[in-house]
Amino acid sequence: MAGGRRGPNRTSYCRTPLCDPGSAGGAAHGGMPSVGGVRSRARSSSSTGLSSPPLAAQTVVPLRHCKIPDLPADRHLLFELQLFFCHLIALFVHYINIYKTVWWYPPSHPPSHTSLNFHLIDFNVLTLTTIVLARRLIGAIVREASQGGKSSMPQSLLLVATRFAVLTGTGWSFCRSIILLFRTHSFFNLLFLCYPFGMYIPFLQLGWDFRRPGLSHMPNTRDLASMDRGSKDYLHVLQHILRHHMPSAEPLPTHACCLSPDLIRSEVHYLKLDFNWRVREVLLSSMLSAYYVAFVPVWFVKSTQYYDKCWSCELFLQVSLSTSVILTQHLLPAQYCDLLHKAAAHLGCWQKVDPALCSNMLQHSWMEECMWPQGVLVKHNKNVYKAVGHYNVAIPSDVSHFRFHFFFSNPLRVLNILTTLEGVLIFYQLYSLLSSEKWHHTISLALILFGNYYAFFKLLRDRIVLGKAYSYTAVPD
């Protein structure tokens, strides 16, 4: 400035990273990568609201994970039996809505000795719908009979006979129903049965089942690239669709709890694929079950038959939401959500800040081999980011890392969402039950509520227990 007096020469602040790239990448359980050799001072930034972390905070402190109790869970076969029973109840109440009669009328009116018009029901459609709804239960029975282990000769014969009887009976009933439907209905009506399976192919776009290998055998980048370049022909996708709807009782992944940034990012990548697969399984299974419960029976109703279309759409939403909550609770148990929470805590998160607010603060060049402590400012792709997590190895510009940390930083987030959805659904069903004036609506809602009560009880129990467990002081593993 003209006429002004220049101050002393300003100190040249170094731009060295917070960790030694040669030692941070190979850290494991035995050693903690500490931030050494950093002698940086932050300039005064009281006007901007940002501050550089003190020197003591620039040392990565090991995480202490909270131990959660082992909550009781239903066996896989028992769970599939309960889910099939809930679907049968929904299908039964929908048939009441379609084929109800006025059996209480006096003989002067059109007489009816039964509560349903059984002569109008197409039992071939009913058989086919029941088999589709029981697909997971059939797969669970066959898998349970195939995994008998070491057993005596009579037990082995019994398991083989059970497997043969289930598969033969299911296949014979399915083929017989399809043949009889071809004789009595048009080809266009039969395409309505295959509509969900045709929609799966563009929706799934699967090339590999990532849930089969364990975390100890995580696929590397070359394997993932070769999987993505693999052929996705029609038969290959159909194979994955059938495998997708078969229940899996495989053990949950385990948490590596490593300190290498590359291994942490690889673990998060695998868990992200596994979580997306489980969510996709929940969505497609619930939509398929709701489709066959609510829409397939009304499509094969005769044109002279009257039914409540609004109730069919409402039943579709209720069945899809109930099935989604029940399947999510089974496929994403508390131990699995805790595993995702631990991985998110190791991954960390970055928050994008305005460069004008931190122009007078120390900014480091982000390096993928480093483990950055909380509050550090880094430069990445011409942007400035601030470390938010306990320690951070995520890529600042990777949106998937940000979403993973945001969604699983709270270990109770998934459980809170499920509990809220189930509570809202039960409240709506109770309100509809109290305000209903038709007898078949009253019976339908009363029967459907029983399954939702049991699911809500388990969700509320897990929420109370885990809420108290996470509220206590973290206990080291």
From Swiss-Prot:
Ranges annotated as spanning the membrane: 76-96, 114-134, 158-182, 187-207, 281-301, 414-434, 440-460
Topology of this chain in the membrane: Multi-pass membrane protein
Keywords assigned: Endoplasmic reticulum, Glycoprotein, Membrane, Transmembrane, Transmembrane helix
Glycosylation sites: 9
Subcellular location: Endoplasmic reticulum membrane
One Pfam family from the record: Tmp39
UniProt keyword annotation of Glycoprotein present: yes
Domain of life of the organism encoding this protein: Eukaryota
Cellular-component GO terms for this entry: endoplasmic reticulum membrane; membrane
Region entry Disordered, spans: 25-54
Presence of the UniProt keyword Acetylation in the record: no
Comp. bias (Low complexity): 35-54
Biological role stated in the UniProt entry: May protect the cells against DNA damage caused by exposure to the cold-warming stress and facilitates tissue damage repair during the recovery phase.
Similarity-based family: Belongs to the TMEM39 family.
Protein name: Transmembrane protein 39B
Native species: Xenopus laevis
